[in-house]
């Protein structure tokens, strides 16, 4: 039924099916933005959290920049960072996470350098479930003009994660705490730190120009969306909003 209702290609036509599908994508974007306290145009649909994290990390960090990660990171963070260390001369420090939040914050603070570009950390560990003091870490980043990239895969939909917590770029999966389908993810940015696209191609907008559009979300959404997955993610977020707000 979803295929019959939302089987058009959003932004690529003017017939009824495509228009209905485009409206569904817009509605899902608004729902996700409202849930996390972001802006719809700054809410980017991705293939999964790994895709979102790669977009953020590779789009923000430049050669010879320094980044800080925690010792609890998923390979979705560790491997992109390791590749940039190996191939682009990026420097990386690993901050140990303690059961004492003050010690964790001190460990991150001690590793800040003049060329620190980003702090990339999970909000909650996928192994132990430990919740990092992400609001305090975000404040630390803001104090030093460092981009806070948050891996929210294990936290979003379970913890009350908001862009107002000081996160600059929030990356998350659709299929975990948001009850969406696999093959969906989100990146939400406050646009303080410009991101370079990871993919280039058709966006259904400004098709006569050879350069990638600068407007968001088009800049980061080349190619056909996972339209059925986005429709499911929209319903999942509505479920969390309507059925379990007291849990988050």
Language-model features: locations:
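Pyridoxal 5′-phosphate
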Residues: 1-248
